[in-house]
Amino acid sequence: MSLVTEFKEFALKGNVMDLAVGVIIGGAFSTIVNSVVKDLIMPVVGVATGGLDFSNKFILLGHIPPNFKGNPDSYKDLQTAGVAAFGYGSFITVAINFVILALIIFMMVKFINKLRAPAPAEAAAPPPTPEDVLLLREIRDSLKNSPRV
């Protein structure tokens, strides 16, 4: 088999194509989750915490250069200028994105597994009572009904 033929078989197998589709959809889905966190959840968290904007929360690690023309309270401006800063607010936002994404994926997998699960089988009829048990029951019943001596 030639290298081209082997690669063609590999690339056109169902699993590789499924993976490619999953990566593309995952990229689009990530954008949606980022928007949900940035535009819907973080503003609510900001209001709940008294108007805090987590994206601009940082600890300055270096010195701001004298020719710095940006906003010294803007993490993005400081990053652009090459100032060392520990951006914990950005990390909090990314961590929330991850938790929400993981929760949504978990719920989707759970839903898909529920759809794939086979329908519960009907309860099987109980097995017939063995003959020796039936015979013992007959003996018991006849002893109950017989007069005592």
UniProtKB/Swiss-Prot annotation:
Transmembrane segments: 16-36, 40-60, 89-109
Subcellular compartments: Cell inner membrane
InterPro entries xrefs: Mechanosensitive_channel_CS, MS_channel, MSC/AndL, MscL_channel
GO molecular function, one term: mechanosensitive monoatomic ion channel activity
Membrane topology: Multi-pass membrane protein
Assigned keywords, A-Z: Cell inner membrane, Cell membrane, Ion channel, Ion transport, Membrane, Transmembrane, Transmembrane helix, Transport
Entries under Pfam families matching the protein: MscL
Keyword Membrane: yes
Family of this protein: Belongs to the MscL family.
NCBIfam families: mscL, PRK13952.1
Protein role: Channel that opens in response to stretch forces in the membrane lipid bilayer. May participate in the regulation of osmotic pressure changes within the cell.
Protein name from the UniProt record: Large-conductance mechanosensitive channel
Gene that this polypeptide is encoded by: mscL
